[in-house]
């Protein structure tokens, strides 16, 4: 791939790529079992049907892609920049018997290899923290969705109010300790996630991200904080 990759993007790929085989298991553990519930809420926002084709961006190990097919009976194209994650995802798709419904490809969200309005809906997870320009990325994502198609995202978030001190305690101390108990690689993830999440939302308040969606031509943007604010789902509809 010839396009330049941002340093934060490159660092995230180097951090997570070796963990593909264990990613889903320990993502569930480190999120206190909330990750599957968040994914289900994300998938439900699309409100689509069986005769649709959905693009799953930053698909990783294909967990969302598989859930989309099981929920809607649709077809899914999943893209991710990590060959290692895609290899795990393809194995999971085969085990699930969904190879005819799900196709996984290597691609980056900032430069999608698809024509305009190619998909009926789009999901992306844990993505915007790793791109240099959220507005440009949202425009690229919206470009490949037909007018009237749903777009939905999931990411970690920073709780407000009384939940904030507990969150800070967990990401500063709990996550690194739990990660190191699993493996050195997961220890690095545990130390990385808190500053990554906090730094992104400090630099890009949710109102700014919603503005990026609207600037990309996405209408009716809504959001829901999950698990006392530890997760965030945004969704909206591609305008005409």
Which sequence ranges carry the predicted segments?
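N-terminal, positively charged/glycine-rich alpha-helical extensions of SAM-dependent methyltransferases
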Residues: 1-22, 182, 186
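C-terminal alpha-helical "lid/dimerization" subdomain adjacent to the S-adenosyl-L-methionine
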Residues: 10-11, 158-212, 222
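Conserved alpha-helix/loop element of class I SAM-dependent methyltransferases that forms part
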Residues: 32-50
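Class I SAM-dependent methyltransferase SAM/SAH-binding core
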Residues: 53-111
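A short acidic, Gly/Pro-enriched loop at the edge of an enzyme's catalytic core
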Residues: 110-121
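A short SAM/SAH-binding and catalytic strip from SAM-dependent methyltransferases
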Residues: 120-134
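A short glycine-rich, Lys/Arg-flanked "PGG" loop and its adjoining helix->strand segment in the class I
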Residues: 135-150
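Core SAM-dependent methyltransferase catalytic element
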Residues: 216-240
């Amino acid at each position: 791939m010839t396009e330049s990759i941002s340093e934060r993007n490159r660092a995230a790929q180097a951090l997570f790529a070796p963990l593909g085989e264990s990613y889903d298991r320990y993502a569930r553990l480190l999120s206190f079992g909330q990750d599957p519930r968040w994914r289900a809420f994300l998938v439900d926002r699309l409100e689509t049907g069986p005769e649709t084709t959905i693009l799953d961006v930053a698909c990783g190990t294909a967990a969302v892609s598989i859930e989309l097919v099981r929920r809607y009976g649709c077809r899914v194209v999943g893209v991710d920049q990590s060959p290692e994650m895609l290899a795990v995802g393809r194995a999971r798709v085969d085990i699930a018997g969904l190879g005819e419904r799900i196709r996984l490809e290597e691609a980056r969200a900032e430069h999608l290899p698809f024509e305009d309005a190619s998909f009926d809906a789009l999901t992306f997870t844990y993505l915007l923290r790793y791109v240099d320009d959220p507005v440009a990325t949202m425009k690229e994502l919206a470009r490949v969705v037909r007018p009237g198609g749903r777009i939905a995202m999931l990411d970690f978030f920073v709780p407000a109010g009384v939940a904030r001190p507990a969150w800070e305690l967990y990401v500063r101390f709990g996550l690194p300790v739990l990660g190191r108990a699993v493996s050195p690689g997961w220890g690095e993830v545990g130390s990385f996630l808190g500053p990554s999440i906090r730094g992104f939302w400090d630099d890009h308040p949710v109102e700014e991200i919603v503005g990026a969606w609207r600037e990309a031509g996405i209408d009716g943007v809504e959001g829901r904080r999950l698990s006392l604010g530890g997760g965030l789902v945004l969704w909206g509809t591609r305008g005409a």
